[in-house]
């Protein structure tokens, strides 16, 4: 099977680097997708569930634990010459954690915003929204930035196992309506549960299509 036809989630993923500042970014090459969201929205848990590896992305009960851009790629590529992974998933620092020192928050914020504005290989940002709380002001601020920077993004609801199943369709419709007029928003809203596995295949397929890969498995 040609390298470009390898299923995206059919083999292990690895962590390749943490990026505390833009100087540490890997060279631009394969297309990237990034995961953004409020602190404790479940980014690390969702990444682990997507790739089927519980310990890949570190999870913590401490909000604001992720302080760098963390890069994950499919394993089995040397990274040299043309032997590059087909894509990278970037776990971005959580936003909206009020108890973090202001200097630290400002540093995280600048790193994330500079990355969003300047990364040519960034294909889409998946903005994670806790299904129990919906879109908050901090989320709206990030969506405003993405619209201004013309960076494509898609809303992904997390922790749907924490709300009544009957309420999920209504929440999907309400969320879609809230972002309907936003210029950079991808119109489809996804719902997921890392705990139950709900919606993971749909998200895997969405990522594969975004980076130009026909199959995710």
From Swiss-Prot:
Q: Does the keyword Cell division apply?
A: yes
| Recorded superkingdom | Bacteria
UniProt entry keywords in alphabetical sequence: Cell cycle, Cell division, GTP-binding, Magnesium, Metal-binding, Nucleotide-binding, Septation
Pfam families assigned: MMR_HSR1 (PF01926)
InterPro entries per UniProt = G_ENGB_dom, GTP-bd, GTP-bd_ribosome_bio_YsxC, P-loop_NTPase
| Positions annotated to bind Mg(2+) | 44, 66
Annotated NCBIfam families: GTPase_YsxC
Family listed:
Belongs to the TRAFAC class TrmE-Era-EngA-EngB-Septin-like GTPase superfamily. EngB GTPase family.
Name of the featured protein: Probable GTP-binding protein EngB
Q: Which organism is it from?
A: Rhizobium johnstonii (strain DSM 114642 / LMG 32736 / 3841) (Rhizobium leguminosarum bv. viciae)
